[in-house]
């Protein structure tokens, strides 16, 4: 594996792949890798000739009072994991390499990005789509791989790629979970032992939503209220977003029985926010069945 820290060196490496006629699979990350990231890497390796992973904690997607400074970082650990996974290029720039001057050009998907997580983290998704666009420009991947845990992010990136005619396929990969059902996340490391034990309320709430749907509950507001109450019964959990939405547009829906719906959760444990989601009413893929 080649560790690359500059844009110039990355461009040279990508040009060499292209001269050799190789397809490129790309996994953008913020580091502190877990099995979910490595699952994305494995998929990229299986479907492409060369695999590029980026590690960059992007300041544009953090708000003023968020966890940019304390976001977990361990490049040596991550490099070892990616070396073992057979990655070809690890691109790990610092902030001045990615943003040598204050950035004035922002890529925004405002309608999709202002809902759900975007409603409690204003500006977050504009930071995401801006850095993803820049990374796509640098890596020039044939395919890019994103975890479905960040469902809204995948939806925004897909729409951005469509609107801007970016020549990359966006591949969503089923959420990878811990043994007790909690979605794998770099932020899980923030949780105290008590909070970690309590955090299983999040996937359990998705199970409860699916149960209510199976029983024929049709009113989205009733589902939202029931799930918010279900989560709030855990003293350490504070639900910030509980929403039933259209899985393609993220718009509110009038009925649960008209078609598949997305149940999106954003739950705080102390200063740590965890997100999770599930599309219910749609036949699951074999990959999604295995992940759950």
From Swiss-Prot:
Positions bound to (R)-pantoate: 61, 153
One annotated Gene Ontology cellular component of this protein: cytosol
Organism: Agrobacterium fabrum (strain C58 / ATCC 33970) (Agrobacterium tumefaciens (strain C58))
InterPro entries (alphabetical): Cyt_trans-like, Pantoate_ligase, Pantoate_ligase_C, Rossmann-like_a/b/a_fold
Pathway: Cofactor biosynthesis; (R)-pantothenate biosynthesis; (R)-pantothenate from (R)-pantoate and beta-alanine: step 1/1
Enzyme Commission identifier(s): 6.3.2.1
Key words of the record: ATP-binding, Cytoplasm, Ligase, Nucleotide-binding, Pantothenate biosynthesis
Swiss-Prot/TrEMBL GO biological process terms: pantothenate biosynthetic process
Top-rank lineage group of the source organism: Bacteria
Organism lineage: Bacteria, Pseudomonadati, Pseudomonadota, Alphaproteobacteria, Hyphomicrobiales
Protein's name according to its UniProt entry: Pantothenate synthetase
Catalysed reaction, written as an equation: (R)-pantoate + beta-alanine + ATP = (R)-pantothenate + AMP + diphosphate + H(+)
Job of this protein: Catalyzes the condensation of pantoate with beta-alanine in an ATP-dependent reaction via a pantoyl-adenylate intermediate.
Binding site for ATP: 30-37, 147-150, 176, 184-187
Pfam families: Pantoate_ligase
Major subcellular location class: cytoplasm
